[in-house]
């Protein structure tokens, strides 16, 4: 009951409640003394918090004889509780829990077993009766059951969302529908009876679980794919490009430098990426046949580099790019962080992109190692974070001078089984072995200059080399190309490059003649034959040559110092004088390693192998000096053996 005005005036007169207008100088101090006296008499009990009570207890008990006063002021322990009460009616029953129910540091089982929680309400709030409180009590069975059901529903939702994320990730990486169906079936067949939770369709958490299942089924039914095609009908000239798809769904493109190639890229995504900001990356890479294409298109160091000549003449930026984007309906940019890449910015909801590609270099400009590799055009579809979603590529791209003609000649013929045909670096007849192109017939020396025999031998070649009409020329080419034909084209034997043999005089010099080489691209093909044979000396002829050279070696040669020195060396001497004469004394280790210690040993090895110095490992720059000195010594020794 609130006091009226008359009662308030009486209280003010008694100085129990001071008035702000009548406060004197010492009124506050007197009031404090009166309050302390009332506390000592037990009339007034102050309001203390739990911390204040503990601190007062420590300070007051230090003074002797004050324990009785302390008990009167604070009362006994039964009246003032050490535990603070909790709020019971401040919120709804479902929310009558502490704020740390879903704390990650506490386990769910521990929260389920803890049936009571304490609030942070102080004792002063209870005394002042600011709101309705109820002291600590145990939850009823109905309240506890509601809390258990709510937590079980939340756990089920978290598990469902986790399974949905794992299913979508595995479906994106592996592309396996079986895995997606299995995971979706697991979520659909989850029984709420495991957690004793009644599934209510009107509950918000239950609706969330249904949405999770529907999203998983949507991801399962959506099949992602991406394709890259060349629009052949939009090419300016059909002869500038050839595009084909093999039975293994591998794509091949042969085009011309400076020709616009219309490209169309299509894709299909699930609804998670439908409204995302996507980007399309385009790369032109090279790879070996043994290398995996999937690795090569992602390797930042596998770009095809433009030649120096075209780079210096290029007018578009970047100057060193092998290709450029033209006539694109989307904005694009260039980047070289992860390889030379053109990036097209797609608008949300786009399902295709059309643009033109122009190549500003060609195969013949590249190095030999790069020409032996296969070039590939790859496109990547990335999300807004730069992560790859899908990719597609054209397995082989060739930039040649006549793409359509070369494709017909080398890929559309019946005998062209491999689409990755490469032009030979050398003509076929230069790669053939000497055994297959040399003339296998022996020429008799007596009849060598007989006109009749020579004419008879040249009749087949004359009939072929001088055809009467175009049909004979075609038949001649077919017979030459046929593997079952016995006719073998005649070609000049390459000159012998052995330095020791030519210096020794065993092989005569061969005069080089310009042959009219046969080429399939020539309008009038001719086959020119040359009748010749390699000179082979008999034993008697070889002996005469050696005797002649030995007699010639007796003539003193003052123009070259090593010749004068080796003329005084004996076969029984060591190698020191010989090596010193040619200023190669440090090469004695090579001779000793091969069992050559004297000049006689060197003569013996030379008669076995005329390329003795190449065999023991003499440097090629010193071979001329070695052979000149040793052959002079060898001829002198042979001349000394001849009868006088």
Swiss-Prot record:
The keyword DNA-binding applies. It comes from the Eukaryota. Disruption phenotype: Reduced numbers of germ cell corpses, hypersensitive to the lethal effects of hypoxia, increase in production of males (Him phenotype), decreased lifespan and in extreme cases embryonic lethality. In cep-1 and prmt-5 double mutants, germline cell death and up-regulation of egl-1 mRNA induced by gamma irradiation is prevented. Double RNAi-mediated knockdown together with ape-1 abrogates the increased number of apoptotic germ cells in the ape-1 knockdown model. Homodimer. Interacts (via C-terminus domain) with prmt-5; not methylated by prmt-5. Interacts with cbp-1 (via HAT domain); cep-1 transcriptional activity may be inhibited by interaction with methylated cbp-1. Component of a complex that contains prmt-5 and cbp-1. Interacts with ape-1; the interaction inhibits pro-apoptotic activity of cep-1. The lineage of its organism: Eukaryota, Metazoa, Ecdysozoa, Nematoda, Chromadorea. Binds 1 zinc ion per subunit. Transcriptional activator that binds the same DNA consensus sequence as p53. Has a role in normal development to ensure proper meiotic chromosome segregation. Promotes apoptosis under conditions of cellular and genotoxic stress in response to DNA damage, hypoxia, or starvation. Regulates germline apoptosis in response to DNA damage. Its pro-apoptotic activity is inhibited when bound to ape-1 in vitro. Plays a role in cell cycle arrest in the germline in response to DNA damage by UV-C light. This is Transcription factor cep-1. It comes from Caenorhabditis elegans. GO terms for biological process: determination of adult lifespan; intrinsic apoptotic signaling pathway by p53 class mediator; intrinsic apoptotic signaling pathway in response to DNA damage; intrinsic apoptotic signaling pathway in response to DNA damage by p53 class mediator; meiotic chromosome segregation; positive regulation of transcription by RNA polymerase II; regulation of DNA-templated transcription; response to hypoxia.
């Amino acid at each position: 009951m609130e006091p009226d005005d008359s009662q308030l005036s009486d209280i003010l007169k008694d100085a129990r409640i001071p008035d702000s207008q009548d406060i004197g100088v010492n009124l506050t101090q007197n009031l404090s003394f009166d309050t302390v006296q009332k506390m000592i008499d037990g009339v007034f009990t102050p309001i203390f918090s739990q911390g204040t009570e503990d601190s007062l207890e420590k300070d007051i008990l230090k003074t002797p004889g004050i324990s009785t006063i302390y008990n009167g002021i604070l009362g006994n322990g039964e009246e003032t509780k050490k535990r603070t009460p909790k709020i019971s009616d401040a919120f709804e029953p479902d929310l009558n829990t502490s704020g740390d129910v879903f704390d990650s540091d506490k386990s769910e089982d521990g929260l389920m077993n803890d049936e009571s929680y304490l609030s942070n309400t102080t004792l002063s709030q209870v005394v002042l009766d600011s709101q309705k409180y109820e002291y600590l009590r145990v939850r009823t069975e109905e309240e506890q059951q509601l809390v258990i059901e709510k937590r079980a529903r939340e756990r089920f939702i978290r598990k469902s969302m986790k399974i949905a994320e794992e299913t979508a990730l595995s479906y994106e990486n592996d592309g396996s529908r079986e895995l997606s169906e299995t995971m979706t079936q697991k979520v659909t067949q989850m029984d709420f009876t495991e957690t004793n939770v009644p599934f209510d369709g009107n509950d918000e958490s239950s609706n969330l679980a249904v949405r999770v299942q529907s999203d998983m089924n949507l991801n399962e039914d959506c099949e992602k794919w991406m394709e890259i095609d060349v629009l052949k009908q939009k090419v300016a000239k059909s002869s500038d490009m050839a595009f084909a798809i093999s039975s293994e769904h591998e794509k091949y493109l042969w085009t011309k430098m400076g020709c616009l190639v219309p490209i169309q890229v299509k894709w299909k995504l699930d609804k998670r990426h439908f409204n995302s900001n996507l980007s399309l990356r385009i790369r032109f890479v090279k790879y070996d046949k043994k290398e995996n294409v999937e690795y090569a298109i992602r390797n930042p160091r596998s770009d095809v580099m433009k030649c120096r000549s075209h780079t210096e003449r290029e007018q578009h930026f970047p100057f060193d790019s092998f290709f450029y984007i033209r006539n694109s309906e989307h904005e694009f940019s260039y980047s070289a962080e992860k390889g030379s890449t053109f990036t097209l910015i797609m608008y949300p909801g786009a399902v295709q992109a059309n643009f033109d590609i122009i190549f500003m270099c060609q195969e013949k400009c590249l190095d030999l190692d790069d020409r032996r590799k296969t070039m590939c055009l790859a496109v990547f579809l990335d999300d807004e974070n730069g992560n790859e979603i899908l990719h597609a590529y054209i397995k082989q791209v060739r930039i040649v001078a006549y793409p359509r003609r070369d494709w017909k000649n080398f890929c559309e013929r019946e005998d062209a089984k491999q689409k990755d045909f490469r032009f030979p670096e050398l003509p076929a007849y230069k790669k053939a072995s000497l055994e297959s192109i040399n003339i296998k017939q022996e020429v008799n020396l007596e009849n060598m200059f007989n006109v009749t025999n020579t004419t008879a031998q040249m009749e087949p070649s004359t009939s072929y080399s001088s055809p009467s009409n175009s049909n004979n020329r075609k038949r001649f080419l077919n017979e030459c190309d046929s593997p079952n034909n016995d006719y073998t084209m005649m070609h000049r034997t390459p000159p012998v490059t052995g330095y020791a043999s030519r210096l020794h005089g065993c092989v005569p010099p061969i005069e080089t003649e310009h042959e009219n080489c046969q080429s399939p691209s020539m309008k009038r093909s001719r086959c020119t034959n040359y009748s010749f044979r390699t000179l082979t000396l008999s034993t008697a002829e070889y002996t005469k040559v050696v005797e002649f050279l030995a007699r010639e070696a007796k003539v003193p040669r003052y123009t070259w110092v090593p010749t004068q020195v080796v003329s005084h060396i004996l076969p029984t001497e060591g190698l020191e004088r010989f090596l010193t004469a040619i200023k190669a004394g440090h090469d004695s280790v090579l001779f000793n390693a091969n069992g050559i210690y004297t000049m006689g040993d060197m003569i013996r090895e030379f008669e076995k192998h005329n390329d003795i110095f190449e065999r023991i490992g003499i440097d090629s720059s010193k071979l001329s000096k070695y052979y000149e000195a040793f052959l002079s010594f060898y001829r002198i020794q042979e001349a000394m053996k001849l009868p006088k």
